[in-house]
Swiss-Prot record:
PTMs per UniProt: Palmitoylated on Cys-2 and/or Cys-12. Phosphorylated by cyclic GMP-dependent protein kinase.
All copies of domain RGS, residue ranges: 62-178
Organism of provenance: Homo sapiens (Human)
Lipid positions (S-palmitoyl cysteine): 2, 12, 95
Protein task: Inhibits signal transduction by increasing the GTPase activity of G protein alpha subunits thereby driving them into their inactive GDP-bound form. Activity on G(z)-alpha is inhibited by phosphorylation of the G-protein. Activity on G(z)-alpha and G(i)-alpha-1 is inhibited by palmitoylation of the G-protein.
Cellular component GO terms held in the UniProt record: cytoplasm; nucleus; plasma membrane; protein-containing complex
Disease: Schizophrenia: A complex, multifactorial psychotic disorder or group of disorders characterized by disturbances in the form and content of thought (e.g. delusions, hallucinations), in mood (e.g. inappropriate affect), in sense of self and relationship to the external world (e.g. loss of ego boundaries, withdrawal), and in behavior (e.g bizarre or apparently purposeless behavior). Although it affects emotions, it is distinguished from mood disorders in which such disturbances are primary.
Keyword Kinase: no
Disulphide linkage map: none
Name of protein: Regulator of G-protein signaling 4
UniProt cross-references to SMART domains, sorted A to Z: RGS
Length: 205
């Protein structure tokens, strides 16, 4: 006579439960990857539509050229997001926004928010700083000024310049923008500019 689940040993029930949990996790991870992939493709389309190839080529000259341009910054951020390492550029952006604050009364709360998010030991998006710079920035939090993150921002910029920026220039995120013909744009009638190639970029990913 069939006893159903009640007749199974406890160890079997635990194994089945563990397997169900693992399958659920894998399905969620798969959905997340597909979602991120879709977002990355859309990001590249928007970027293509808003910038010329001449400008894109300037991005290879320096990291400063890249992130000082709105679309270049968006492209670089999308690339870092695909590598799950966008905390460095997020910190750099936060520092740039911080330096634009005009009201002295707003400096302290904003500084503490940036510190807690990127620099403290329990930071949710901790950036890779050497101990000296981290300690110096921590001391600056006692009396935050408009320049209290300058040294830390400089270190993170140099880190991105030597590492992620070089990878970005070799990635499809950049190569598809600087050379849209590699996506088959030359086969499309009327493809006269990078904007015309926008719809083709996602198909190359």
């Amino acid at each position: 006579m069939c006893k159903g689940l009640a007749g199974l040993p406890a160890s079997c029930l635990r194994s089945a439960k563990d397997m169900k949990h693992r399958l659920g996790f894998l399905l969620q991870k798969s959905d997340s990857c597909e979602h991120n992939s879709s977002h990355n493709k859309k990001d590249k389309v928007v970027i293509c539509q808003r910038v010329s190839q001449e400008e894109v080529k300037k991005w290879a000259e320096s990291l400063e050229n890249l992130i000082s341009h709105e679309c270049g910054l968006a492209a670089f951020k999308a690339f870092l997001k695909s590598e799950y390492s966008e905390e460095n550029i997020d910190f750099w952006i936060s520092c740039e926004e911080y330096k634009k604050i005009k009201s002295p009364s707003k400096l302290s709360p904003k500084a503490k928010k940036i510190y807690n998010e990127f620099i403290s030991v329990q930071a949710t998006k901790e950036v890779n700083l050497d101990s000296c710079t981290r300690e110096e920035t921590s001391r600056n939090m006692l009396e935050p000024t408009i320049t209290c993150f300058d040294e830390a921002q400089k270190k993170i910029f140099n880190l991105m310049e030597k590492d992620s920026y070089r990878r970005f220039l070799k990635s499809r995120f950049y190569l598809d923008l600087v050379n849209p013909s590699s996506c088959g744009a030359e086969k499309q009638k009327g493809a006269k500019s990078s904007a015309d190639c926008a719809s083709l970029v996602p198909q190359c990913a």
